[in-house]
Every structure is written in C-alpha cells, then in structure tokens.
Amino acid sequence: MKAATIARGKLRIGLLVAGLALAGPSTGAASPMLVALTGDGMLITFPAEHPGDARTRKPSGVSGQLIGLDRRPANGLLYGLTAAGDVYTIDPVTAAGSLVSTLTVPFNGGSRSGLDFNPRTDRLRLVGHDGQNLRVNVDNGATAADRPLAYAREDPHFGRQPLIAATAYTNNVAGAETTEMFDLDSGLDLLVRQEPPNDGTLRTVGPLGVHVPPEAGFEIVTDGGGKNRGLAAFASTLYDVDLATGAATSLGTIGGPSGSIVGLSTIAGSP
C-alpha cells in the first residue's frame, strides 16, 4: 500500500473518530471508537459509551468470508482474516479491503475463534474453538503452529476442552514492552489468561456472569495512562469486562443489524 494512500486513510479515520467522539459523554475522556464484525460480514462502527449510535458498512474488495478483525498497534491499520486464510487491510470508514498476505498454515477455527495482535512482538495470534493456536506475520503470511490450548494442570478446569470464542492482549499500543493475553471460553463462560501464549496454557481468571456464545468479539483498550479496559461484544450487546475478576457489565445494545458478533476492535485514533 502506498504511503499517500495510508495517509489519506488515516485522515478519514481521524475525522470519523473526531466526529463521533463529539456525540460521546462529557466525562473528560473520549469514548473509545470500536468496529464490530457481524456473522454476515458487515462492519458496525460505534463509540463504546453509546453502542446504539452506530454506522454500518459492507466490506468491498474482500474475497470470501471475514471471520475476525483487529487493529495492528504497530501501524494503526485494521486487518481482517477470511475463512480461506487471506489477510486484508480494511478501511473502517469506506470498508474497502486490500489483500496483504495468505497464511502458510490453514486455520480451522472459522468464526468460532479469537484473533488479536500481540503489541510486543507484532504478530497476529489466532486461537480456535478446536484448540488451534497460531502466530502469524501478516506482512508475508508466515505462520507458526504453537502448542494447542489446554488448561494448566493446577487449574480447576484442567482436563476440560477449552472452547475459545475471542482473545485480546493488554497494553494494546505500539512498542509495548509487556503484555498479557486474555481469552473468552464460551463452554465455561469464563475469562481466562493464556500464559504463556505460545504454550497455549490457560489459567482461569473468573466467571463472566453472562453466557458467551461460540461467536464473540473481545478487545482491550489501553488509554494514555496505560490503563487497560476489557470490552466484549456478543448477541448484539457490548460489555465491560473486569480483567481482574472476569465480571461482565452490559453497556447496551449495539446499533445496526441484529445477530452474531464475530470480531471487535478499536479504530486508530481511539484513546
């Protein structure tokens, strides 16, 4: 992608964020701008504090079914993955996609999976409902297959098959020196830590208090002071997720088309 094209895309994103932030609450802090991917492939953009104030776009230039998306901290661009393993950049304003690479190892998770960039290593993590655990260089598609997901021997859920529906990393900013990886288990309705990520070892944090469907979105927003905030979206509802306990609190219904949410991400320029 040419530098001029990227610059224009970032300008459009900045204008969208600024415009929608004006409609947010006057709390002294701007509301994070989010984009959700629906099960039928639509993009819904909205502020976290007012999820009903949404704009919907249909992606163009993407071949196949999108199964997840995330903003890459290293460059601020939004990336999407298709069921065929193709990686695209996606303009969150126009929803136009541009092919970047293709995974060298097939990912079998489909939309029942988690997808998020590790901000420290600049690699895209993919975790599937079947326990698959991949690490991707999105620039060339080079994919490493790490150890399958499993609960730690000392965890109360050791021996249970994890059914991971979404994943997210803390310290979600460029150049992060440290990060933690969290997953949502839809079989047990839990928030769990994946520690260490490459080993696929899961450790229970706590119950969400709500049912997590097999298709869900999860994002961790890091503000300018380094504070991490968990946000999850499923069944057309946005939730705050306490990363210390797992407790989920509803923030309201997401506007736009009803149905499943399969991905959630911030937009570049959000706090």
Spell out what each predicted region is.
Residues 14-23:
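Bacterial N-terminal signal peptides
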Residues 40-44, 84-88, 130-133, 188-190, ...:
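Loop/turn residues immediately N-terminal
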Residues 48-51, 91-95, 138-141, 196-198, ...:
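Short loop/turn segments that connect beta-strands within beta-propeller blades
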Residues 243, 247-271:
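Blade-level signature of beta-propeller repeat domains, shared across WD40, Kelch, NHL, RCC1
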